[in-house]
Amino acid sequence: MERVCKTEDIVEQRGMVDANDMADTKRTMTETLSRLYDHRKEAGALLDLLDGEGKITPLIEKGVQKILERVNGRIMEDDPFFAYFYLQLDHQLRTDIASPTASNFKGGRYCLYINPYQFLSLPMEQMKNAIKHEILHILLQHMSRANILKKSYDSYVVNLAMDAVVNNYLQDMPRDAITVPYLNERFSLELKPFRTLEYYASKLQAAYDQLKADKDGQDTQSQEVDQELSDIEGESDQDQGGDPVEYTFNAERT
């Protein structure tokens, strides 16, 4: 027997549709507001406060944490895996690291370090990349692998190689960030993308050794080569032994 569609059924179905539409609309509005959020004013105020206080106060720490939550919310929209991984990390503000972010294994947990002076100066996309960069270092076990490689290779070469590996997976990088194309141009190499840390370290060490050999062969006119070597060592992370693996995305490179 054919069921007669009652008015109550129509109203109920229409209510379900409206509820779903409202939920979708609310979700869309939330995402839109998140993308419209401009962190620069808030970050600028915190930087002014940092300059005035000369140290990290509870108020500054709370403000930076709020911005970090916003940044992770943006990461959640595009890469939920990275966002959830970020939530599992300890977080600590430090002003004694040379990069916006750094990471280390401490007390049985991974810790993400934030240099507020540098991190707060970054655009939103670079903030996202800085966090994802550190997570990739952790996932690829770069800390333990680097300790082994540094027994055979120069520390700055290994650091360049680590950054080349992780930056393969990141987008919207500045032209002179430590990427495979950048290193190819810098060293006149033909490195392939998405290769191992050991591959990049080996190739970069050979190029670096050649530069040093060129320097030794130019006793009187070696200023240019000296500058080249100095620039290379300055581009890589600082060798800090057991200290954090640092993210080399310089705030000035925009």
Model-derived features: positions:
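Short, functionally important secondary-structure microenvironments
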Residues: 1-129, 135-254
